[in-house]
Amino acid sequence: MEGPGAGSGFRKELVSRLLHLHFKDDKTKVSGDALQLMVELLKVFVVEAAVRGVRQAQAEDALRVDVDQLEKVLPQLLLDF
């Protein structure tokens, strides 16, 4: 059984649109499996960013996560992915 918010995530249409914004050739297509994989990857990336942001805020004794904490964890997060 999955936890709270398990049904939330990125819509395939949104991810497809984001990918196509960066393709040089307009005829480039993305298979359904590749699209599903990108949806899952983005979901994991965002959750991991949130968790690391919370840990950084706790280390700084901050009561809430701010963009400053996310900016501090982003370089290592990008290297890990």
Swiss-Prot record:
Keywords in alphabetical order: Acetylation, Cell cycle, Cell division, Centromere, Chromosome, DNA damage, DNA repair, DNA-binding, Kinetochore, Mitosis, Nucleus
DNA-binding keyword on record: yes
Modified residues (N-acetylmethionine): M1
GO cellular component, as recorded: chromatin; FANCM-MHF complex; Fanconi anaemia nuclear complex; inner kinetochore
Compartments reported by the entry: Nucleus; Chromosome, Centromere; Chromosome, Centromere, Kinetochore
Alphabetical GO biological process terms: cell division; interstrand cross-link repair; kinetochore assembly; replication fork processing; resolution of meiotic recombination intermediates
Source organism, top-level taxon: Eukaryota
GO MF terms, alphabetically ordered: DNA binding; double-stranded DNA binding
UniProt xrefs under InterPro entries: CENP-X
Purpose of the protein: DNA-binding component of the Fanconi anemia (FA) core complex. Required for the normal activation of the FA pathway, leading to monoubiquitination of the FANCI-FANCD2 complex in response to DNA damage, cellular resistance to DNA cross-linking drugs, and prevention of chromosomal breakage. In complex with CENPS (MHF heterodimer), crucial cofactor for FANCM in both binding and ATP-dependent remodeling of DNA. Stabilizes FANCM. In complex with CENPS and FANCM (but not other FANC proteins), rapidly recruited to blocked forks and promotes gene conversion at blocked replication forks.
Subunit: Heterodimer with CENPX, sometimes called MHF; this interaction stabilizes both partners. MHF heterodimers can assemble to form tetrameric structures. MHF also coassemble with CENPT-CENPW heterodimers at centromeres to form the tetrameric CENP-T-W-S-X complex. Forms a discrete complex with FANCM and CENPX, called FANCM-MHF; this interaction, probably mediated by direct binding between CENPS and FANCM, leads to synergistic activation of double-stranded DNA binding and strongly stimulates FANCM-mediated DNA remodeling.
Family: Belongs to the CENP-X/MHF2 family.
Name assigned to this protein: Centromere protein X
Lineage of origin: Eukaryota, Metazoa, Chordata, Craniata, Vertebrata
